[in-house]
Amino acid sequence: MKLVLASKNAKKLDELRRFLAGTPVEVVLPPDDLPDVIEDRPTFRENAAKKAISAARHTGMLALADDSGLEVDHLKGEPGVRSARWAGAHGDDEANNRMLLQKLRGVPLHKRGARFVCALAVARPDGTLALEVSGSARGRILNERCGTRDFGYDPYFLFTEEGYEETGRGFAELTPEEKLRVSHRGRALRELARKLPGIA
């Protein structure tokens, strides 16, 4: 089975290939003319589905897309689907983290619950959805940076789910392997790898 990734991000492709190694699934990058999709849906699931359907129709192949972000309890789920562009420019991690800390100023740690969410969708060339999976990881938002692996909101996210070696550590403190064991993306990818062979 061959899947086209609804993203030109080579890092995402490498990550997927690692997860799907040993399965009969091959993931490839999309053609250069893959149209950009406006992520204007209210949920991660709907945005992932929209991107997967667009890529599947454009390429005539099964297509895989993802959408992910941070939901903070005290902020009623913000930044949510706007996580990457919350402070304005898409992908400005520093500005997004500044806004996060500003909005949580004065809020005690025990009221800073949050979760990362990742939604994955696979669509068929006719525009129907073949598979949807998701994963999440609970934690708290810290006042100070924790760890050196800067990516998105990771430097301020403390993983708090009980029963893991990684419990009580910041996402930015974890190695890539440790993070994939407990992260929203790792959990969604494991579910994808488990279910994907069944849609052939």
Where do the protein language model's features map onto the residues?
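Anionic-ligand binding patches
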Residues: 1-4, 11-200
